[in-house]
């Protein structure tokens, strides 16, 4: 998915539909160009892809972010996702915990 401003891509989301294999949709990556951050675009994009994937009737959506990425944490929470667990030392360079979110339907 792409978030556009005219012909310019200013955000994107990559998802994986695990329905039939593991019965969830995974938010693999979601990014917004630095010039467009702190305007609610991450939540807008996350809400859009979540609503699009509802057509597949997944029991849950999953996603994660770095402990330091407060903006993405707010986007998850704004869209109804709840912190499911914190996984220490999940990311490297720099070493950081992952905040794992889930939205159950």
Where on the chain are the PLM-derived regions?
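Residues forming the Rossmann-fold NAD(P)(H) cofactor-binding site
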Residues: 43, 70
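Residues on conserved beta-strands of the protein kinase catalytic domain
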Residues: 23, 97-99
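Conserved GNAT acetyl-CoA-binding A-motif
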Residues: 53-65
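Structural motif
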Residues: 56, 78-79
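Conserved catalytic-core motifs of GNAT/GCN5-like acyltransferases
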Residues: 64-65, 80-97
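Short, hydrophobic-biased segments on the C-terminal half of alpha helices
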Residues: 73-74
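Active-site acidic-Proline motif in GNAT/NAT acetyltransferases
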Residues: 33-35, 39, 67-68
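Acetyl-CoA-dependent GNAT
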Residues: 1-35, 46-48, 52, 89, ...
């Amino acid at each position: 998915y792409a978030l556009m401003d005219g012909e310019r891509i200013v955000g994107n989301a990559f998802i994986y539909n695990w329905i039939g294999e593991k019965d969830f949709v995974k938010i693999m990556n979601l990014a917004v160009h630095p010039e467009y951050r702190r305007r609610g675009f991450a939540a807008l994009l996350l809400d859009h892809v979540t609503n699009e994937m509802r057509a597949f009737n997944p029991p849950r959506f999953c996603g994660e972010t770095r402990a330091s990425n407060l903006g993405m944490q707010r986007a998850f929470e704004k869209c109804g996702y709840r912190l499911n667990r914190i996984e220490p030392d999940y990311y490297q360079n720099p070493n950081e915990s992952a905040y794992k979110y889930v939205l159950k339907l």
